[in-house]
Amino acid sequence: MKIKKFLILALLIILITPGCSITKDSMEDITIYTTIYPIKYLLDSLYGDNATINSIYPSGVDTNDYELSDKKLEEYSKTDLFVFNSLDKDRDYAVKMINKNKNLKVIDVSLGITYVDDITELWLNPYNYLMMAQNTKDGLLEYIDNPYLISNTDGTGIENKYEELKYNLSRLDADYKEDINLATYKTIVVDDDMFKFLEKYNLRVISLEDNDNLTDSTINEVKKLVNNGTIKYIYSSKDETNDVCKNIINNYAI
């Protein structure tokens, strides 16, 4: 009797299993290439459990100066997915890689986004970075069929991860607003236009970046503010600042 029951159960399993088999999604366990860390961070956050994510750039290089060889582009074009920023030189790489592999999947994270002063606004500004996250999420969803990878009760789906990112970036945006609103003096001096995105929070940002926008009037105003003690710091994005800032620092003991 026990043997009969076992045989019946085994037969049922054989009959049922083909109809319930789970097909692995073509986007599982893939290799994704991207460019800079802010984009890689989004990919790691949204899909890092299901893919190997690498940068096309060697570690430690200045991506502004580094140029990829045609041999490297040939290699990267064979990957499963390339995620790039079309507002940067990434776009040229994407075009070359697509020309080498017409089947290459791509996602443009900067779709519909613009910047005013510096490209770093795309990831330093929480609102812009959230748009980048949404573009990354939407791009992944275009290629993925498995509902579990999209959203699940375990909280590991792309939609679940996106909601976490959205919450954290919204908190950061709120912190910016609150901290600047509580500041007694709402003017800062910086050495790079990348900080000017803070103006959206009603903070006056005086940039001493050495470009066509820098005037003698601006430099003289900063000297006056430093001299009378109103400004005590110049915020820098780099270890080495430009000559204009060095001159003010050396002559006014800031």
Residue spans of the language-model regions?
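Extracytoplasmic metal-acquisition and chelation regions
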Residues: C20-I254
